[in-house]
UniProtKB/Swiss-Prot annotation:
Species for this entry: Woolly monkey hepatitis B virus (isolate Louisville)
Domain statement: Terminal protein domain (TP) is hepadnavirus-specific. Spacer domain is highly variable and separates the TP and RT domains. Polymerase/reverse-transcriptase domain (RT) and ribonuclease H domain (RH) are similar to retrovirus reverse transcriptase/RNase H.
Residue ranges of the region described as Disordered: 211-235, 258-288
PROSITE patterns: RT_POL
Region of interest (Terminal protein domain (TP)), ranges: 1-176
Name this polypeptide is given: Protein P
Catalytic activity of the protein: DNA(n) + a 2'-deoxyribonucleoside 5'-triphosphate = DNA(n+1) + diphosphate; Endonucleolytic cleavage to 5'-phosphomonoester
Enzyme Commission number(s) from the entry: 2.7.7.7, 2.7.7.49, 3.1.26.4
Location of the Reverse transcriptase domain: 345-590
Positions that bind Mg(2+): 417, 541-542
């Protein structure tokens, strides 16, 4: 028989009805719950009607949304972020000694370390994920530009050789110990011949030096090594700057110097290049030994031929165009395309790093509200699954009640935005080989994505470039012509292969959120101790400050901003928001009245119910998305999570769920009328409840009550009923009980009707645990009133979450002057402390 909505509300005790001691135990009856489920069409029976796979914006939890490429994306500009290395002494000079907990958390990131037991290496062709098949070339260049921007900002290392890397920025102490110096091992890239190398040809100057012997002639013979080996001398009179010497990922290539009066013919240069390629294939250099290629003898048989350079891009300048869309026309636009590669200001030794990657990258919109800027997505998912998975450390996430207890105060609030928060935390160089990103170069990437013949790679391995025009096409020509207006001569630089490792903590790693949460929570703990009359709280990169007046808040903001900037933390002043008394934080609006969800979440729920169909089976994957949205707001409704249990059951069984009209109306009424989650108050417990399978007992001050059930009930159900009776008849918001299930406030495993009603009755009620021997309601629950036991003095303290996110800061030592850097409107004795 169908059930009307009014009768259903009355059944759940949401409206006035029968006496509580009679109506509430009936809700635990299994037969009644079954009949109500039949009346609401919630039996979860298999249906033959086709499932609905899309409800409004929800299309299933596992459906992959199509990414949209924006050719006009702007790459964000990153400053040279350098967190102070002597962080702990610097803070102690500001605010006095730190606690051991604060020191422990700060040491985790100075530097951070990541050493997985196993790492998979992938070919460079998989460095850039092909998520935009229609914009392959544009996406490639934007990713290359983004990676170079991060490298120049000191976020990435650039792999120079198997055992060396270069970077920009200020070196840390642990990098000084591994530093090569400021002179790069290779200055002359492939295909770019030195303009200052006038003089005789280099025949006889290069000797085969595989075992580390010094060359007998030329500038390469005067570079002494350090005693430890592997470090290039910075004090040498003739540093490693050979003319026309290229160091590639596979070896060294020597090119002859170009001079107007040079007698070296171009046929020899072609043979020289081929010999260099074959030699570099046979021998891979190490960090201790340089291998110099012996140049072949001169030949005069092939005069007039152009040299075949090892640079794919520059070879188009000397070749004949194959068509109107040949890349030769683009390369001829400039006479000087610049070097094939750049080097950082500093060089360091690194562990053996192969010419491969460990994670792919691609670009997306910066956020749903900003499609003009791009964001680099790094996929290091290999460390979260399979044989290379890593067990990430767990850290506390504040729940709704803890946030409300902590932040629901009559303070004025301001939120700070930390610019590129993850890129503030330095990584040890030994972690670089596990966090590699890059690309294989333009020709190999285009050939792979377009599924064309990979002739360039094959012929390049053989030392020839006969199929130079294999990738010439109208699409590539038009794309490069348009990109030339944006990048200019950088088209050449970005067309080369690139391998980079992270110098700062990447966002795509499971370890990063833990490190950032520990770091920001330690900083806020220091701020709270320095300004005990104020409030500072952080979760990840969200930092909020609170004070009792607007003037006080502005002074606090100025002092904290100066302190953070002194630490090397960059803030985004454009995103600093002043909220007044209502703080918007983590999706909630938190004020003196309590917490409520933000308006944009309410709008999503209203749209969800508007699009939700009735009497049609909905795919359980779509139900997962719907429940994910409704579950976030469930604590603000009358019946909480218990009202969603029919949908949860279908999801667990992988069955479609059908919304009846009454059930949809019930949920819509629940979510259109929200109640704030109030802040809990400390106090002494005066009301106690206890139950047995056959009876219940209450103690309310000097008053005692007892009763019996019509039939024996499970002990947890009986304890829950006793707590509901105590809340309704005493009106107390603090109740003592000895049942752990009632204390947990998780009522989703009780009979559905009872769980919904109990959630509404016990809303806003706090529980405190009392042992059974000390529970004064234990005797009344067994039917024995007897003498009244003295009430135990139980103090309830509201929870503010785990100590890793919020810890009570010790006061400033008395022998130090006050660290408040402004005239505080509060008296020193009126120090406000978080609840």
């Amino acid at each position: 028989m169908p059930l009307s909505y009014q009768h259903f509300r009355k059944l759940l005790l949401l409206d006035e009805g029968d006496p509580l001691e009679d109506a509430l135990p009936r809700l635990a009856d299994e037969d009644l719950n079954r009949r109500v489920a039949e009346g609401l069409n919630l039996q979860h029976l298999p249906v033959s009607i086709p499932w609905t796979h899309k409800v409004g914006p929800f299309s299933g939890l596992y459906s992959v949304s199509t990414l949209t490429f924006n050719p006009q994306w702007k790459t964000p500009q990153f400053p040279l972020i350098h967190l102070k290395e002597d962080l702990i002494p610097f803070i102690e000079s500001y605010f006095g000694p730190l606690t051991s907990n604060e020191k422990r958390r700060l040491k985790l990131v100075l530097p951070a370390r990541f050493y997985p037991k196993a790492t998979k290496y992938f070919p460079l062709e998989k460095g850039i994920k092909p998520h935009y098949p229609n914009d392959v070339v544009n996406h490639y260049y934007q990713v290359q530009h983004y990676l170079h921007t991060l490298w120049e900002a000191g976020v990435l290392y650039k792999r120079e050789t198997t055992h060396s890397a270069s970077f920009f920025g200020t070196p840390y102490t642990w990098e000084h110990k591994l530093q090569h110096g400021t002179q790069p091992v290779n200055v002359q890239p492939a295909g770019i011949l030195s303009q200052s190398s006038a003089g005789p040809p280099v025949q006889g100057q290069c000797r085969l030096s595989r075992l580390g012997q010094k060359s007998k002639q030329g500038p390469l013979a005067t570079s002494p090594r350090h005693g430890s080996g592997g470090l290039w001398s910075r004090t040498s009179a003739t540093p490693w700057r050979p003319s026309g010497v290229e160091f590639t990922s596979s070896g060294f290539v020597c090119h002859s110097a170009r001079h107007p009066s040079s007698s070296i013919n171009q046929s020899r240069q072609r043979k020289e290049t081929n010999t260099s390629y074959s030699s570099s294939e046979r021998h891979s250099p190490t960090s201790h030994d340089l291998e110099h290629v012996l140049l072949p003898e001169l030949s005069s048989e092939s005069k007039g031929q152009r040299p075949l350079l090892s640079c794919w891009w520059l070879n188009f300048k000397h070749c004949q165009p194959c068509s109107d869309h040949c890349l030769h026309h683009i390369v001829k636009l400039l006479d000087d395309w610049g070097p094939c590669q750049h080097h950082g200001h500093h060089f360091i030794r690194i562990p053996r790093t192969p010419s491969r990657i460990t994670g792919g990258v691609f670009l997306v919109d910066k956020n749903p509200h900003n499609a003009t800027e791009s964001r680099l997505v790094v996929d290091f998912s290999q460390f979260s699954r399979g044989n290379t998975s890593v067990s990430w450390p767990k850290f506390a996430v504040p729940n709704l009640q803890s946030l409300t207890n902590l932040l629901s105060t009559d303070l004025s609030w301001v939120s700070l935005d930390v610019f590129a928060a993850f890129y503030h935390l330095p990584l040890h160089p030994a972690s670089m080989p596990h966090l590699l990103v890059g690309s294989s170069g333009l020709p190999r990437y285009v050939a792979r994505v377009s599924s064309s013949t990979n002739s360039y790679r094959n012929n390049n391995n053989n030392g020839t470039l006969q199929d130079l025009h294999a990738n010439c096409s109208r699409h590539l020509f038009v794309s490069l012509m348009l990109l030339y207006q944006t990048y200019g001569r950088k088209l050449h630089l970005y067309s080369h292969p690139l391998i980079m490792g992270f110098r700062k903590v990447p966002m795509g790693l499971g370890l990063s959120p833990f490190l950032l949460a520990q770091f920001t929570s330690a900083i806020c703990s220091v701020v709270r101790r320095a300004f005990p009359h104020c409030m500072a709280f952080s979760y990840m990169d969200d930092v909020v400050l609170g004070a009792k007046s607007v003037q006080h808040l502005e002074s606090l903001l100025a002092s904290v901003t100066t302190f953070l900037l002194a630490l090397g933390i960059h803030l985004n002043p454009e995103k600093t928001k002043r909220w007044g008394k209502a703080l918007n934080f983590m999706g909630y609006v938190i004020g003196g009245y309590g917490s409520l969800p933000q308006q944009h979440i309410r709008d999503k729920i209203a749209l969800c119910f508007q699009k939700l169909p009735c009497n049609r089976p909905i795919d359980w994957k779509v139900c997962q998305r719907i429940v994910g949205l409704l579950g976030f707001v469930a604590p603000f409704t009358q019946c909480g999570y218990a009202a969603l249990m029919p949908i949860y059951t279908c999801i667990q069984k992988h069955q479609a769920f059908t919304f009846s009209l009454v059930y949809k109306t019930f949920l819509k009424d629940q979510y259109m009328h929200l109640y704030p989650v109030a802040r809990q108050r400390a106090g002494h417990c005066q009301v106690f409840a206890d139950a047995t399978p056959t009876g219940w007992g209450l103690v309310m001050g000097n008053q005692r009550m007892r009763g019996t059930f019509l039939s024996p009930l499970p002990i947890h159900t009986a304890e829950l009923l006793a707590a509901c009776f105590a809340r309704c008849w005493s009106g107390a918001k603090l109740i003592g009980t000895d049942n752990a299930v009632v204390l947990s406030r998780k009522y989703t495993h009780f009979p559905w009707l009872l769980g919904c009603a109990a959630t509404w009755i016990l809303r806003g009620t706090c529980f405190v645990y009392v042992p059974s021997k000390l529970n004064p309601a234990d005797d009344p629950s067994r039917g024995c009133l007897g003498l009244l036991k003295p009430l135990p003095r139980l103090l309830f303290q509201p929870s503010t979450g785990r100590t890793s996110l919020y810890a009570v800061s010790p006061p400033v030592p008395f022998h130090r002057p006050g660290r408040v850097l402004f005239a505080s409107p509060l008296q020193p004795g009126d120090a406000w402390r978080p609840p």
